[in-house]
Amino acid sequence: MKDKISMPLIEAMLQYKSEDVYPLHTPGHKGGRGMQRLLRQELGASVQMDVSLMSELDDIHEPETYIKEAQELAAQTYGSDACFWAVNGTSQAIHAMLLTALNPGEKLLLPRNAHRSVAGGLVLGGIEAVYLQPEYQPEFGIQMQVTVQQIETALAQDSKIKAVLLTSPNYYGVAADVQTIADCCHAHNAVLLVDEAHGPHLGFSELLPPSALQCGADACAQSTHKILGAMTQCSMLQVQGARLDLQRAADVMSILTTTSPNYLLMASLDAARAQVQAYGGEMAAAAVQAAAKLRSLCAAYSGLRVMEAADCGGLQLDTTKVTVNFAAWGYTGVEVGELFREARVAVELVDAYNVLFLVTYADVTTDYDEALARIAAVLDKMQAQKRAPLQLAAAAQVPQTQAVLPLRDVFYRAKRAVPLAQAVGKICGEQVSFYPPGIPVLLPGELVTEEIIAYCQAQKELGLPVSGPADSSLQTIRIIAD
């Protein structure tokens, strides 16, 4: 029965393909006939499924048949009242959450380490941000989650806060206390929005933390492509309850969605939903088991520290995210990531002291076991060449910032570039992040300080890529023109 779960859009696309219709319509490559030879060879028969928006296949802007049914099935699968497909990734879904929940000038309470895409939503919506500093985990040198006490205090002090945004789980798999926070938000008549980019697999097994929807969130943005079987840039926005206007959410999603959505991308969302609907529990178990093999491998090396739930201050951990700290061996995360890449293993994230491996249900093949063997070979070599331990410096923690101007105001202000060292005391005119994880170090409108410059220089020296500024080398930074 599981294999007979409906995939409405895919079934409609296959039906259209079987009719052998000659396409005197877009796209211009005409079912692959005109596509560059090498690309066509690599893509294979799938190019015939790259079809145009037409009534036979439904319209994501006005869904009435196959897309409507597929999105309804996704909502049923996750237990929401409505699901909206996002073909511009979770960034689009986050923007839609903010524009649905808040009007211009209203306040959003959020952690300062929210993903950089949130800043774009604040600009689009003219929303005022009220930031909270997440708790810090000194042994791994990473930011964790904001607490219910912080949120309770902020909501009690400012009745103009209309919504709260969480990132849960965070990049490292640490889940916030979403249920308690949801209760707190609703008691203060605020809606709870969750960036659940790294949690589309939650809610299908007790081996993992519960999902945001199960914990009472009003909406969540999920990266179906990050953890499940959808193609890159495919995500979902889930909405539940009466606190958000579903029609407004639909209108916002339509505004933010291209009028030429790729049907292969949407088909992959349909397929990923069907897969997790049928096998979600088995997929979760497979991922947890595969991650456990990697955890055991790394933990067997003296000095390496693998993040466990006990390191999370009472919060739950998605154990399919495997964070390994190499400070005791004297290696930075960047260096270790490069060593693994030389051994033909690419990791999800590196930072000053850690490497993050992302394990999913797909890591059950002999290829995965071979990758584990290559990881072990690298670790054996590193163990024989251990260095003096690294001291987890305070510089590992992003310095606190001070907002001087609203993001939207800065977006429309004139800016000029100055050498980074000369920007102290100036108002930043652009976003500065190191990606991944894409957490802004500086946001437009914030004051540039010596501490922030020192932090940025330290991250550059580690070799972490800069994201956001016009000058990607960060030799210069744009500030508000005097």
Say what each PLM segment does.
Residues 342, 348-482:
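PLP-dependent enzyme catalytic core of the Aspartate aminotransferase-like
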Residues 9-14, 20, 38-40, 62, ...:
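Conserved PLP-enzyme active-site core in the AAT-like
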Residues 47-90:
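Conserved N-terminal alpha-helix of the aminotransferase class I/II PLP-enzyme fold
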Residues 1-65, 437:
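N-terminal "arm"/small-domain region of PLP-dependent enzymes with the aminotransferase-like
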Residues 282-356, 383-399:
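Conserved small-domain helix->loop->beta segment predominantly found in fold-type I
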